[in-house]
């Protein structure tokens, strides 16, 4: 299970969003399961912390950064952009 998925002409992006400022491995379980079914998808974990991290192919992004990048993330999923 993931919170939401974007699909467009450049592929799939899957997102898990948590309010917490701390990350534990079990929080990434849904993204890892989704990635098994869709290995080419880009995975994002958005959380309430302050550090940008990476866990394997999962990009871990602070909420503030994700909000600033939202126009880019959304335009990526629009067909023809």
Language-model regions, residue ranges each:
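A cross-kingdom feature that marks ATP-driven nucleic-acid transaction machinery
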Residues: 1-81
């Amino acid at each position: 299970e993931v919170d939401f998925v974007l699909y467009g002409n450049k592929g799939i992006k899957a997102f898990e969003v948590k309010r917490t400022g701390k990350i534990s491995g079990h929080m990434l379980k849904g993204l890892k399961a989704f990635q098994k079914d869709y290995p080419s998808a880009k995975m994002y974990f958005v959380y309430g912390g302050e550090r940008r991290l990476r866990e394997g192919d999962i990009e871990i992004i602070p909420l503030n950064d994700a909000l600033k990048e939202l126009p880019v993330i959304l335009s990526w999923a629009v067909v023809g952009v």
